[in-house]
Amino acid sequence: MSAHLNEVRNKSKRKWTIPLTWFGGKAWLASKIHQYTPSHTTYVELFAGAAHILFAKEPSPLEVLNDLDSDLMNFYQVLRDPRQFAEFERQVNLTPYSREQFEECRDNWHTYHDPVKRVWAWFVIHRQARNGMPEFNWIYDTTQIRRGMAASTSRWLGSIEGLPEAFERLRKVQIENRDFREVIKMYDREHTWFYADPPYVLETRKSGKYRWEMNNGDHLDLIDMMLDIKGMCLVSGYDSDIYEPLESMGWEREIVSVHSGSTKESRQEILWFSPNLSRALQDKRKGLELISGKT
């Protein structure tokens, strides 16, 4: 095990590093959602993507990352396996920030059968492409400098330097690669907190696509299940009439202004809170107020 990894484990206050950028990712919203963490035993991200919320929160006794993208989940599997992670880390440390290397990985990654080599090539593509989207070209800089080097090179090296923290955070996380309907049924308990950040409703976005999209029927199935679960749930997405049934059944909502992707265009993201989540957060606030009043 690397000395760097041992240093990570000895930190009293850990800053978890997010290893990926992802279309529809919630890096900009993670700290806000972290404020809405209820008392819970099990945490489930139904549509993991880059898992920004998991990396923003403190570990729970039982945690689950789920996504239908099998290559994404294979990446997380390699990151949490000590033997595979050691080899993966060795390979990425030997990988230059190179257009030729990027194009070779982009053209051949799907032909690699060795799981670590496949994940290595997949990671190179996602970290060296613009906005982390492999259908885009290799990103390079002509003027932007960061840490005494091209900003794009700095970001690549930073993503490698953060891998030990990602390994440490994922060690005890369960990885699922299932339809969200199955995962809800499997993990729904009174003390489960579900975070659902599904692919945006198609009519609410101008561009971009996920590898695994959801049609309106899928969104309606998600809503039906959320209205019938025992656990608590926070749903995020762009405003859509499809999600109106949540509000009609007592779910609270909060509007958050955000910037869309790499543009400066302002969009409004909606957070929907299940009634039992709202109650749990109220109880948490009251408890903190009581503690504060005694000090």
Q: What feature does the model see in each segment?
A:
Residues 2-29, 36, 82-195, 199-207, ...:
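SAM-dependent nucleic-acid methyltransferase catalytic core
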Residues 81, 141, 274-278:
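Serine/threonine-rich low-complexity intrinsically disordered regions
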